[in-house]
A protein has these predicted regions:
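Conserved short hydrophobic interaction patches
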Residues: 32-35, 84
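A short, surface-exposed loop/turn module that caps and links secondary-structure elements
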Residues: 34-61
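Enriched for short, Lys/Arg-rich terminal
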Residues: 1-7, 16, 60-66, 70-96
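A cross-family signal for key residues in well-ordered alpha-helices
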Residues: 30, 37, 79
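Arg/Lys-rich, positively charged N-terminal/basic patches that mediate binding to nucleic acids
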Residues: 1-32
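Short, intrinsically disordered, mixed-charge
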Residues: 23, 34, 38, 93-96
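Solvent-exposed, flexible loop/coil residues
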Residues: 12, 46, 50, 54, ...
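Short alpha-helical segments used as structural interaction elements across diverse proteins
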Residues: 14, 19, 23, 51-56, ...
Length: 96
């Protein structure tokens, strides 16, 4: 699967969270987004209320971060990012 096949877009929530990141956090995030573009199935597919959403886990400075996204034909929508604490509760609230 070619990474140039996908267009990346983001929700306002994702944009607000990334705006608070430091430069090195953004660089790590960019690498992880490239990994998702290369293999959109890399994230765990969610069920129930979050059906159609995938969550990719990665570490930054020993802290695990979760990146929620969805894939539609030629677009990857970055939904939200954060640590595990209250992550799924907040994600469900945003998706509804």
């Amino acid at each position: 699967m070619s990474s140039d096949r996908f267009r990346i877009s983001q929700t306002p929530l994702f944009g607000r969270k990334v705006k608070k990141f430091k430069k090195n956090e953004k660089e790590t995030l960019d690498r992880e987004v490239q990994r998702i573009m290369a293999d959109p199935d890399i994230g765990a597919e969610k069920k129930g209320d979050l059906q159609g959403i995938r969550v990719h886990r990665y570490k930054f400075n020993s802290q695990e971060l979760l990146l929620a996204y969805s894939v539609e034909e030629d677009e990857i929508l970055l939904i939200t990012i954060g640590s595990h604490e209250n992550y799924y509760r907040d994600l469900k609230g945003y998706v509804k």
